[in-house]
Amino acid sequence: MSSRILTSDVIGIDVLLHDHHAVLAKSTGGAVAVFANNAPAFYAVTPARMAELLALEEKLSRPGSDVALDAQFYEEPEAAPVAIPCGKFAMYPAWQPDADFQRQAALWGVALREPVTAEELAAFIAYWQAEGKVFHHIQWQQKLARSVQISRSSNGGMPQRDINSVSEPDNHIPPGFRG
């Protein structure tokens, strides 16, 4: 167990119990760290040092200036929850999964390392809009999780290649072959 000692004067509890007045009188700064079983147990403080500490604490608890800010600067407006249609509904262009979608997907057995990209969401929405099926919001999220899982795993977890890119030939000649 790590600990921080806040004074350079360290004594054992036996010494403090034997003559605490002498120990505190010899201390620098009016404070002594008391150890029991080679571990810090508590601090012994002189009455004068305790008065200093209490005065300092009281001073720090008062505001540094008499300028008070309006309460509006401290109060943040509550975010209006996104309206999720009740019951079953057909997919629509502005549909979004919940903010904690990744956590929910993990509960359904779909571990998504990264959040759903805008492209994945757009492809999902476009497909299901054309289908015209109706499901509950949670069912749409489950379908999205499975869809993303399947699309990501179909390429070995790698992002899909751009079909418009021109591939570069490998010009490296292995050892033992003539080029």
UniProtKB/Swiss-Prot annotation:
Signal peptide (UniProt feature, chain positions): none
Annotated segments matching region Disordered: 151-179
Biased composition (Polar residues): 151-168
Transmembrane regions: none
BP GO annotations: DNA replication, synthesis of primer
Keywords from the named record: DNA replication, Primosome
InterPro entries: DnaT (IPR020917), DnaT_DNA_bind (IPR040480)
Region named C-terminus: 84-155
GO CC list: primosome complex
Subunit structure as annotated in this protein's UniProt entry: Homooligomerizes. Interacts with PriB. Component of the replication restart primosome. Primosome assembly occurs via a 'hand-off' mechanism. PriA binds to replication forks, subsequently PriB then DnaT bind; DnaT then displaces ssDNA to generate the helicase loading substrate.
Domain characteristics, as noted in the entry: The C-terminus (CT, residues 84-155) forms a 3-helix bundle.
Family: Belongs to the DnaT family.
HAMAP family reported in the protein's UniProt record: DnaT (MF_01061)
Function: Involved in the restart of stalled replication forks, which reloads the replicative helicase on sites other than the origin of replication. Can function in multiple replication restart pathways. Displaces ssDNA from a PriB-ssDNA complex. Probably forms a spiral filament on ssDNA.
Protein name: Replication restart protein DnaT
Protein's organism: Salmonella typhimurium (strain LT2 / SGSC1412 / ATCC 700720)
Gene that produces this protein: dnaT
